[in-house]
Amino acid sequence: MYGNIEKIHFVGIGGIGMSGIAEVLLNLGYQVSGSDLRESDTTERLRSLGGEICIGHAAENLTNVDVVVTSTAVQSDNPEVIEAKHRMVPVIPRAEMLAELMRMKYGIAIAGTHGKTTTTSMVATVLTHAGIDPTIVIGGKLNTLGSNAKLGQGKFLVAEADESDGSFLTLSPTIAVVTNIDADHLDYYTGGLEQIKDTFVSFINKVPFYGLAVLCQEDRNINEIIPRIKKRFMTYGLSSQADLRATHVKLDGFQTTFTAHYKGYRLGEISFNMPGAHNVLNALACTAVALELDVPFDKIQEGFAQFGGVGRRFTVKGEKNGIMVVDDYGHHPAEIRATLGAARNGWPERRLVVAFQPHRYSRTKELFNEFVTCFYDADVLVLTDIYAASEQPIPGVSAERLAEETRRHGQRDVTYIADRNDLPDYLAGIVKEGDIVITLGAGNIWQAGEALVKRL
């Protein structure tokens, strides 16, 4: 970065999006400090890398800092934000700092309402295996890396582009991937789905004339915006109309296999260890990026064979007494359908016991009708109270009402357990040999899964 920027402070440094950028900056030699509300594996890792980490937000945490970085979860009344403005220290959003990192490299930005983290992780794995050695910033922990970030020596930076507040428009990627477009974050996108589509068009058209947009042809909303795309693009999907196509899809437990074809030519078979038809599309997006960078197909195949998954994406927490406990980040109705569909297709004979923690009052309200019909692949459904994520309750919006409505819409076995801490004992009392238990949600529901494993 130009000038005398030496020390960078992150408010909410323990967040998955913030910590990755902080780690890359530490590895680049910058002084990094930050604060978070609680200790975690992430804060411990950053501290071990040389970061100055404070627990709790306070004005005195800002010691000789040159810039303050905030996430979307940080409010304007945060004491560190107030102090920074008082000292006339620049306060910038996380995406602006990511854009600065991307400016130093050729950026590969993976965007979309769903599938960003998995696709970014696949791209990072395949390109690393191919010797491209990209810098990596992911919204989840890549299992083979043990982290969500890495400073590479190559020319490319692979990053997840978060559309939740429109700030991904600060990025200027050379390659832009859009996995899908769906209604979400409607507290920000008050214009609804049409505003979301407009924003994605703007994002895609930021690609330079020599770059590429990689677009999923299976997504109706992407198909609707294709006539507005002004840059070179490649489509992928299951249709014969897609530039990059998958056929002969096989889903067997955790193993997913398909045959890839590019513009009518058979490339060969790709196989990886992550279940679900939706991950075939994520793998195609990754393959498209690799082909654009002239990675030989055999290297692409080898990279997928090494893919070890990503944290909180159909992650097995343990298996005891014939009961498998899985955790997944899915918190949008489309993601829930995809995850439960993956479990149903991969293990068709096993009973699925699903514990779901809704994430945010605003999302639960805006997508309520979709939520009540997205759990049909679950044999047993348990709902617990909404994870607020700093939001205030909305009258009439509750997990208890969601449980009532899912039951009214045909879900046969639905139970509401108000306190998440009561879930492990409840689940331990109802599960039996052969069950698959899936904890779902973007909050702290994963803790219930870990506690359940200890009780089995």
Swiss-Prot record:
Chief place of localization: cytoplasm
Pathway: Cell wall biogenesis; peptidoglycan biosynthesis
Biological process per Gene Ontology, one example term: peptidoglycan biosynthetic process
Organism superkingdom: Bacteria
Alphabetic keyword roster: ATP-binding, Cell cycle, Cell division, Cell shape, Cell wall biogenesis/degradation, Cytoplasm, Ligase, Nucleotide-binding, Peptidoglycan synthesis
Molecular function (Gene Ontology), one example: UDP-N-acetylmuramate-L-alanine ligase activity
Record flagged with keyword RNA-binding: no
GO cellular component annotations of the record: cytoplasm
EC class (word): ligase
Catalytic reactions of this protein: UDP-N-acetyl-alpha-D-muramate + L-alanine + ATP = UDP-N-acetyl-alpha-D-muramoyl-L-alanine + ADP + phosphate + H(+)
Record's subcellular location: Cytoplasm
Binding site for ATP: 112-118
Entries under HAMAP family matching the protein: MurC
Family statement: Belongs to the MurCDEF family.
Name this polypeptide is given: UDP-N-acetylmuramate--L-alanine ligase
Lineage start: Bacteria, Pseudomonadati, Thermodesulfobacteriota, Desulfuromonadia, Geobacterales
